[in-house]
Amino acid sequence: MKLYLVILVTSVALAAASPTRTKEEPIEDELLEALLSVEKSLFNEETTVMEKRSCVIGWKQRGQKCERDCECCGVAATCIGERMPGFCGYRTTNNNLGQYILYGYSTVSNGVSAILCAA
């Protein structure tokens, strides 16, 4: 019986000391606002055409012609094509594990390629 009372008192004390839900409301409001802005951008043609990029000026975007991997914009973007010039893009596979391995390989390959291109 004493153990039951200790558990009851402890659980009531923890419930009283726990943070209230009002602290999480601004975070939920920010997430809802972000979701609404993304939803609006899907229907707005101007925002869907323009993509946010953090590339150096002169790097090629996805689909543009290239000769080396270091010319393409993106961490794992590579110059794809049998003949020169190729085009910038991402190598893909249907297997999820294979896709992660391919992404890692492309990232390392681009790092080495960037060093060689800078030299």
UniProtKB/Swiss-Prot annotation:
Main function: Probable ion channel inhibitor.
Residues in the signal sequence: 1-17
Record lineage: Eukaryota, Metazoa, Ecdysozoa, Arthropoda, Chelicerata
Keyword Signal: yes
Subcellular location: Secreted
Residue pairs linked by disulfide bridges in the UniProt entry: 55-73, 66-79, 70-117, 72-88
Gene source species: Hadronyche infensa (Fraser island funnel-web spider)
Tissues in which the UniProt entry reports expression: Expressed by the venom gland.
Name the UniProt record assigns to this protein: U9-hexatoxin-Hi1
One GO MF term attached to the UniProt entry: toxin activity
Proregion positions: 18-53
